[in-house]
């Protein structure tokens, strides 16, 4: 099978036949969502011949691997992995933001670029970051919640890219993220720490959705 290569701001899926998480499942990481931080000098590397998926979270990597093994393209795998990342590390890779894609088609040897950077809303004004008394909000309060998010462009970009480079049904690429969110997962340390610094989020309607 000739896999295409995709390089995305949130995910890299390479053409390899061996994967670090070859026999593991998403459920295996319910109690260990984050890998240990170690000296980069001790980092290991792998060489693959058929496909390889690399993400910031093992559950997203496993999801990408599953899609590739089911006959999906690298774009399909990237989308499925992104939905997992949106769930387990929304502070770093949420669908409420934007991204860029560089996609290499091994058959045509063409490189495709997709721009999904978010933009400010048309009616945006600096007053959004001011309190009712006219003074500016603190940093954490200002950047937390829906008002600090630009017009999301990530999902529309993925949908358009999928129309060109994907072959699995669009809705099936959300299955792993839906399953993980429905069954529950342990929140990683970084997300827990950042959430604790923004207790006002529980009172924001936009943050609760």
Where in the sequence are the language-model features?
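N-terminal secretory signal peptides that target proteins for export/translocation
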Residues: 1-2
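Sec-dependent N-terminal signal peptides
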Residues: 5-13
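Cleavable N-terminal signal peptides
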Residues: 9, 19-20
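N-terminal signal peptide c-region/cleavage motif recognized by signal peptidases
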Residues: 15-17
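Noncatalytic scaffold domains of N-terminal-nucleophile
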Residues: 23-62, 66, 74-75, 79-209
């Amino acid at each position: 099978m000739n896999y295409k290569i995709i390089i995305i701001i949130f995910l890299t899926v390479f053409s390899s036949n061996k994967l670090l998480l070859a026999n593991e499942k998403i459920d295996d990481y319910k109690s260990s969502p984050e890998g240990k931080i170690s000296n980069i000098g001790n980092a290991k590397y792998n060489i693959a011949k058929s496909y390889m998926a690399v993400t910031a979270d093992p559950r997203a990597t496993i999801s990408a691997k599953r899609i590739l093994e089911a006959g999906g393209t690298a774009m399909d795998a990237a989308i499925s992995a992104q939905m997992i990342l949106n769930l387990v590390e929304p502070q770093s890779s949420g669908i409420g933001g934007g991204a860029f894609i560089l996609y290499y088609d091994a058959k045509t040897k063409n490189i495709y670029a997709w721009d999904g950077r978010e933009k400010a809303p048309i009616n945006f004004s600096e007053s959004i970051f001011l309190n009712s008394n006219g003074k500016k909000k603190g940093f954490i309060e200002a950047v937390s919640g829906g008002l600090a998010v630009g017009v999301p462009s990530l999902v529309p970009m993925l949908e358009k890219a999928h129309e060109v480079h994907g072959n699995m049904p669009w809705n099936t690429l959300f299955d792993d993220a839906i399953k993980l969110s429905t069954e529950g997962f342990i929140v990683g340390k970084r997300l827990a720490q950042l959430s604790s610094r923004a207790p006002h989020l529980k009172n924001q309607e936009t943050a609760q959705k």
